[in-house]
Amino acid sequence: MLLRRGATEVVAVDVGHGQLAWSLQQDERVKIHDRTNIRELTAEMIGGPVDVVVGDLSFISLRLVLDPLLAVTSEDGDLALMVKPQFEVGKDKVGKGGVVRDLDLRAEAVRSVLDAAAERGWGARAVTTSPLPGPSGNVEYFLWLRHGPGSVDAAAVHDEVRRTASLGERSDKVGP
C-alpha cells in the first residue's frame, strides 16, 4: 500500500526470512532486512532516520520495541502502529483461542502503548479500529503517533473500543 501511495522506498524488517510477498521482494524500491530483530534495529542499519514507520508486529508487545522504532523515526516523522491486544495484555488475560474479548482489556492494551509512547515524548494523533479482525478474530487497532503531545486521551481510546465492541466492526477515526 505504501508504494501504491507514492513511497519512493520501503524498508521491510522481519526476524524471519522470506515472509514478504514475492512481488515486493522483487521490487527495487523495497529494501529487505530479513533475519533482523526489531529490538536491535538502528537508523544506521537502514540508511538513516525515516519519515514514516508502519508497524505490524506479532508475538511481541509494541512497548518492548518502541525505543528502536522511535530511534529510526525522524523527529518530525509519523508512526502508524497496529496494536494487537493479545500481545499487549499478557498471556494470563488472553481468552480461549488467543482472543481478547473483554473490552476493558482491549482498551488497556491500546492505552498501554499510548502511555509508553507518551513517556518517550510521542503522542497519539488518532486511534482507529482495523476494519479486519486478526486471524483468530482479535479486534486490532491502529495508533498514529507523532513527536509531541497527542490529541487522543484514555477516554477517546475507551470510546473507540466501546464503539467497535463487535469483532470486525469498522469505526470512525478518533482524533483530528
PLM features: what roles do these ranges have?
Residues 1-6:
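Conserved SAM-binding loop of SAM-dependent methyltransferases across substrates and taxa
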Residues 20, 84, 137:
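Residue-level signal for inorganic ion chemistry
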Residues 83-102:
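Short, glycine-/aromatic-enriched active-site segment of Class I SAM-dependent methyltransferases
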Residues 106-120:
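Short alpha-helix
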Residues 139, 143-176:
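Flexible, glycine-/basic-rich loop-and-beta segments that form/coincide
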